[in-house]
Amino acid sequence: GAYHHITVVGKEDAFCDHIYDVTGSLCENNDKFAIDRKLPKIDIGDRIVIHDTGAHGHAMGFNYNGKLRSAELLLREDGSVELIRRAETLDDYFATLDIPGGLMKPHA
C-alpha cells in the first residue's frame, strides 16, 4: 500500500471529483498505484503522471512475467520532458541468455 502521487497532465488545477483505480500492467492483484483515488475527470488521450513508480522504475524493477522495463522520462520544473532511459527491447531481455549446445535438441 505505498502512496504514489498522480496527476493528470493539463488538469493539475482541476477539481478532483472522480474516483479511479490506477493499476499497473502485470497480472497480479497487488499491482496497483492507487485505489479509490480522487482525480480530475480523465478522458481518452489524457496523460497521467505517476511521480514515483516504485517497482515499475529501473531502480526496483525486474522482468517479472517477462515484462520489459519502460522508458524513464524526467519532467523538469519548466515543464520540459527529457528521456533519461530508453525502454528495454527483446534483445535486451535475452542478451544474457546462454543455452548450452545440447539442451535444445528436438525430441525423437
Could you describe each region identified by the protein language model?
Residues 1-108:
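Charged (often Lys/Glu-rich) extended helix/loop segments that serve as interaction or gating elements
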